[in-house]
Curated annotation (Swiss-Prot):
This protein specifically catalyzes the removal of signal peptides from prolipoproteins. GO terms for cellular component: plasma membrane. It is a multi-pass membrane protein. One of its GO terms (molecular function) is endopeptidase activity. PANTHER family: LIPOPROTEIN SIGNAL PEPTIDASE. Pathway: Protein modification; lipoprotein biosynthesis (signal peptide cleavage). The keyword Repeat does not apply. The lineage of its organism: Bacteria, Pseudomonadati, Spirochaetota, Spirochaetia, Leptospirales. The chain crosses the membrane at residues 15-35, 44-64, 65-85, 97-117, 155-175. This is Lipoprotein signal peptidase. Its EC number is 3.4.23.36.
Amino acid sequence: MKYFEKRFLDVYRPIYLGVIFLGIVLDLVTKFLVILYFQPHRYLEVFGSFFRMTLTFNTGFVFGAFQDNAIPSLIATGVAIVFLIGYRWKNHDLGNPWGWNLVMAGAFGNFLDKFFVKIPGTGFRFGFQPNMGEYIGVVDFLDFDWPDFLLFSRWPAFNVADSCVTIGLTILIFTMKLEEEK
């Protein structure tokens, strides 16, 4: 018995690959624009103090945990992407494909972003090198203030790729739960 019952393009149809590509492009373009027009840790209020755009760099993992661990973060993200591709291919009928597409777009967007050195005012330069007055890490810029009853006053800044992963996982959790109940 073959491990993968379906061909790759039967599971990852061209329309799905197009959505993944579109998500990656949207993520990287927004990050590029923020790099060009914002200075690190200076913000622009969009909806008062509730929603601001603030350029930050995450050199760690989720929510900025374990900062200055760019290489382990890059490796972990790469392993997760390979796992997700294989898992989705093997379990092609599990969950909503659009949820998978969004998770993949976000994972690839942040993975690619980890390979670029960011230079405020000039944009991106390809290469993974030590920080020499430049910025290495994932660009985060969507900055929300939440009610004071939460453990922190501002949610950690995030980006379009993070939004894709969150929305995609939410879709997958709900659709898998519905499939389980049937």
